[in-house]
Amino acid sequence: MRARRGRCHTRKVADTNKELADFLKRARSQGDPMRAGLPTDGRVRRVPGLRREEVALLAGVSTDYYTRLEQGRKITPSPGVLDSIARALDLDEISRAHLQNLIGTTTARPSRTTPSVQRVRPGLHQLLDALESQPAMILGRRMDILASNPLARALFSDFDALRPRERNYARWLFLDDAAHELFIEWDAQARAAVESLRFAAAGHPDDRLTIELVDQLAQSSGDFRRWWAEHRVYQRTFGTKRLRHPIVGELSVDYETLTLPGDPDQTLFIYTTEPATSSRQALDLLVSWIQPAVTSRAE
C-alpha cells in the first residue's frame, strides 16, 4: 500500500502528462473571474476558479484545444499560444517557467542530460570559509547540500556528519526532528522547500535521484505528500528565517541567494543579521562557540 501511494507522487517521465494536467487544473481553479474581466450574472459558481471555456476564450484558442492540453495530451503549443494561456491563468514568472518546463517534457525535443555528481570548485570552498561571521552554504540540484561553512553547520545542522546521499536540504527539513524544532515557522519553510523542489524537478524530469527523493519524502511525510499534490511552484531568492537555536536561543536571519557561474543548478545562500540586534549578538555568540574547533582543525 505504501509503495502504491509513493508512486502517485513520484515524478516519472510516464507521469509528465499527468503533471501538466494537474498543474493546469490547479491554476484554473485559482483563477479570479472578476480579475480576468469576465462578466458575472450574479449567480454563485458551483466550483471556484475559471471554467475551461473561459480560459480558452481569454487565451484565444478553442475550448477543445485547451481541454486536450489540460488533459495532458501530447500537443505542442506555439510560444505565442503558451504565453496567452499563461496570461489567461494569471501565472507569475516562476509558474510560467514551470509551465514551459512541463510543456517541454511532453515534446520530442532532445533530452537534457543530468550529470550524476555535482562538485563545488575549490575557490568556492575558500569563499565559504572566508565568511567567518556569516553562515553560508551552496545548494545544488534537487536542493542537495554541496558545501557549507562552519557557522552554517553550527546554526542549522552538521551536514558534513551525514552520509553523502542524506545531505539534502528538503530531506533534512522534513525528516529530521531537530529541523522541526529549529524553525519557529516550520510550515512556511517546509512549504517553500516543496515549491522549490517541484520547480527543480520539472527542469530535470528524468533525474533518478530527484525521483527517489520525492518518492521517499512522499512516503515518509504526510505534510510533504499534501503540499506536493498542490502543484505550487516558487523560487525564493531572499527572505527571513526565524530560528529557535538550542544554544543561542531565538534569532532571525535574512538570506540572499546567488546563482553561481558555470553551473546554474548551484546556488549560494548567505545569511545575515541586522547589526546591533539581539540576533547579531546570538550569531556572534555562536561564532565564539565554534571558534576553538575551527582553530584546532586549521592547526
Regions found by a protein language model. Give the residues of each.
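Amphipathic, well-packed alpha-helical segments that form the structural scaffold of globular domains
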Residues: 25-32, 100, 104, 129, ...
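Short amphipathic recognition helices of helix-turn-helix/homeodomain-type DNA-binding modules
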Residues: 3-10, 14-25, 77-83, 87-119
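Recognition helix of helix-turn-helix/homeodomain-like DNA-binding domains
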Residues: 41-46, 52-53, 59-76, 84-86
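Short polybasic/polar patches that bind polyanions
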Residues: 25, 29, 57, 87, ...
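Hydrophobic protein-protein interaction segments
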Residues: 122-299
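An N-terminal domain-cap segment
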Residues: 35-49, 109-123, 129-130
